[in-house]
Amino acid sequence: MFWLGFGLLLLALSLYLLYVFERQSRIDRLTHKWPAPPALPFIGHLHILAKLVGPHPLRRATEMINEHLHDHRAKLWMGTKLYLVDCNPKDIQALCSAQQLLQKTNDYRVFENWLCEGLFTSGFEKWSHRRKIVMPAFNYTMIKQFVAVFEKQSRILLTNVAKFAESGDQIDFLQLISCFTLDTICETALGVSVGSQSSAKSEYLDAVKSILVIIDKRLKNIFYRNSFIFKRTSHYKREQELIKTLHGFTEGIIQKRIDEINQDAENRNYQSSDAELDGVKRTLCFLDTLLLSKGPDGKPLTVKDIREEVDTIIFGGFDLTATTLNFFMYNMTLHPEHQQRCREEVWSVCGKDKSEPISIEQVRQLEFLEACIKETLRMYPSGPLTARKATANCTINDFFIPKGSDVIISPIYMGRCKDFFPDPMVFKPDRWAIGAEPKIEATTFIPFMAGARSCMGQRYAMVMLKMVLAHLLRNFLFEPLGERQVKLKLNFVITLHTVEPYLCRAKNLD
């Protein structure tokens, strides 16, 4: 009886392995145009991907991509899972627009305990419906209304930086700027002031940092990706504690806004998405839009529906923007000549009077400052890579993509590729000047991604970045803090960060 059972088990295993082998062989034939290093039976390229384990994973990943990408494409098997890496500019627009490639991969599920099914993680149908709801909250008309908030929060930031300038103490720039971006996104998109810039400590910011570390562990540990295993670890218990803090924060914001609307004597203004304020039509903010919206079933969105979008917009609005500001200031302290040129442009356009507000018309004229921001995003995109799941077979420029495979696009690879940007590791803002040669192709620079699932807040982000940086550079001179700060080490923890906090010093400008 034992040998019969053993024989049947062996037969079943053999049939399964035969099925796997035949399936992989068939897919390999269909995807033969994709360049690939030699693969081993059944495990595929796991022996190559294993090199990512260990210190400096970002550097290891960069070296692996540079070694195995040909014509900026590659095919890699992780066991029975197929990954297609495509960073060819000829493919980008089609890749990012193809209906079959609008689904995020299963890797993004590690965010779902926190972000649930918001715009960042949701499937195509839900994402499509929600995006249509919230897009008006980030149009240019709305951004112009946000300028007053950008100005107000920038002034608070200037006061905080001035304290460091007077004392001569070192500045943890990311910590300082994260409070600014959190306050700004909450007041503009959610209509609520949270005052983190005025607080000595932000429990929410600390919780975000901690949960990103846990999510990073799940992404890098194949066993932790399994929910059954992960729920039996201490990391899960800690994650639940952090989620309680994070969801409590956002639910508090939602309730506060509901109370404010209910108490508003002009509550009738919130009955449509085109309320009037002092006789001028305005679009409702992100949160107000959600509060008045309905789902595909015709019913109002639930508190959970609203919370998952609020969590997503806060994460995307404050963390990703803060890292960009952090890397920008790093570049400015590393290249004081560019910092001074930005400052002189601000003086020329906005004047030297520090008390004068900066208008959106002036912001639009700060061309060199924008070039420095773009150069920062090229070298240090906050999202170094993105991945999409093929929900059906498709073909992009004669390259077949089978259903079920994952397609990876890497903005950091493209931004640092010498084929697209000469001297890619040199900070050269002038490459963005009008008429500069060689001309930069739009599909080689995708820090906000491209196509249907591109970042809907990119114009918002650029205006906010330019305004706060114009204020900072008009008021202070920023300097690096020693050699350690010049030789910056990077870490990929969901978003791109520095291994050690970036520290600098500020000096008041007379």
Swiss-Prot record:
- Give the enzyme class: oxidoreductase
Coarse class of the primary localization is endoplasmic reticulum
Q: Cross-referenced InterPro entries, in alphabetical order?
A: Cyt_P450, Cyt_P450_E_grp-IV, Cyt_P450_sf, Cytochrome_P450_Monoox
Residues engaged in binding heme: 455
Membrane topology listed for this record: Peripheral membrane protein
Subcellular location(s): the record lists: Endoplasmic reticulum membrane; Microsome membrane
Which Gene Ontology terms cover its molecular function? heme binding; iron ion binding; monooxygenase activity; oxidoreductase activity, acting on paired donors, with incorporation or reduction of molecular oxygen
* Keyword Cell cycle assigned: no
Keyword Iron found: yes
Instruction: Give the EC number(s) listed in the UniProt record.
Output: 1.14.-.-
**What keywords are assigned to this protein?**
Endoplasmic reticulum, Heme, Iron, Membrane, Metal-binding, Microsome, Monooxygenase, Oxidoreductase
A GO term from the CC aspect = endoplasmic reticulum membrane
Q: Which co-factors does it depend on?
A: heme
Function text: May be involved in the metabolism of insect hormones and in the breakdown of synthetic insecticides.
UniProt family annotation: Belongs to the cytochrome P450 family.
Q: What is this protein called?
A: Probable cytochrome P450 312a1
Per the UniProt record, the source organism is: Drosophila melanogaster (Fruit fly)
Q: Which gene encodes it?
A: Cyp312a1
